[in-house]
A protein has these predicted regions:
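Enzymes that bind and transform nitrogen-containing heteroaromatic metabolites
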Residues: 1-173
């Protein structure tokens, strides 16, 4: 996320330290929920790195982790998904996440600003892990678009990573 709250995967180049943070996050989870746009962006990148590793450990490890994790994809336009361990879901996002949270297993990750905003009200997100990049974009997809009520949060962790990225963990209070 940019300093002004926008998400744009093309604007950020993750370094080894940032990807290692993502690797740690993915190790604690067994499911990720995607919208169509984020799913297609990830599907077009990471499976190829599994086949042809870059030689950069954190990148290659992340490719394997995201390739192996269970991927739940929400879309009104996709007819099928082909990436390994992916499942297309057409039922209500909130209902599906409530169902997933009731199952045993590890953490559930949410990928994509639209889904994060939708799941923030009602409070279906247990923890926000934000990575703020030192750039002001001025436009793009806002992380918390269409939030109609304030959400009080408590900071549980902060850390400055390489390249000036700040990791912020918050829980709703």
């Amino acid at each position: 996320m940019s300093l002004d709250g926008y998400c744009n995967h093309d604007a950020f180049n993750p370094d080894e330290e940032l990807l290692q943070n993502f690797n740690d996050l993915f190790t604690e989870a067994d499911t990720i929920v995607f919208g169509r746009v984020t799913y297609q962006l990830m599907e077009n990148s990471w499976p190829q790195i599994v086949i042809n590793p870059t030689g950069m450990k954190a990148f290659d490890d992340f490719a394997v982790l995201i390739d192996n994790i269970s991927k739940i994809v929400f879309s009104n336009t996709l007819k099928n998904v082909s990436w390994k361990n992916s499942r297309l879901v057409t039922r209500d996002l909130k209902e599906e996440v409530i169902y997933l949270k009731q199952q045993s297993g590890k953490n559930i990750l949410v990928g994509g600003p639209g889904l994060i905003a939708t799941l923030s009200q009602p409070c279906l997100i247990d923890e926000y892990r934000l990575y703020v990049h030192p750039i002001v974009l001025g436009n793009g997809l806002p992380l918390f678009k269409n939030i109609s009520e304030s959400i009080n949060l408590k900071l549980t962790e902060s850390k400055i990573l390489g390249a000036g990225v700040v990791k912020l963990n918050y829980v709703p209070v």
